[in-house]
């Protein structure tokens, strides 16, 4: 089971996006005697092709993960819709974090990391800026 593997291998799980996964992580953590910190993945653009809890349901998932399953929710992460101004999405994530007392905001990639930092990002993903474009077959 992937949740059990994640608990065994990782200190942080960055993609908690539904209650079913929170339950699986909590059960695996109990069996292993160790619990990774988690970031809740928020689908700020409500894009059907992307994973992540909707912004309007994030508070409930955070509370459930903490109170029902005893998970350490450390922060939030998002990837804004391609072709849209990322700033409103980053501000939405920042407001969710403030409301829930979360310190970690993983948002922003090579093309928008400066905006993400202005909006409070603590983690940015800048692989393309560091290593260049991927060669895709």
Language-model features, listed with the residues they occupy:
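Active-site loop ensemble at the mouth of alpha/beta enzyme cores that anchors a bound cofactor
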Residues: 123, 136-137
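Active-site-proximal glycine-rich helix-loop-beta segment
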Residues: 120-122, 127
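Conserved alpha/beta-domain cores
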Residues: 1-104, 109-111, 117-119, 131-133
């Amino acid at each position: 089971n992937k949740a059990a593997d994640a608990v065994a291998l990782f200190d942080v799980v960055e993609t908690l996006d539904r209650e079913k996964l929170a339950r699986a992580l909590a059960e695996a953590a109990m069996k292993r005697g160790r619990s990774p910190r988690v970031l809740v993945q928020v689908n700020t653009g409500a894009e059907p092709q992307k994973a992540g809890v909707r912004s309007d349901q994030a508070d409930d998932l955070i509370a459930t993960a903490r109170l029902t399953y005893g998970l350490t929710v450390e922060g939030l992460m998002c990837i804004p819709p391609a072709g849209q101004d990322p700033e409103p999405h980053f501000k939405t994530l920042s407001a969710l974090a403030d409301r829930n007392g979360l310190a970690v905001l993983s948002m922003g990639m090579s093309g928008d990391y400066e905006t993400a930092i202005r909006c409070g990002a603590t983690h940015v993903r800048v692989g393309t800026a560091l290593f260049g474009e991927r060669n895709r077959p």
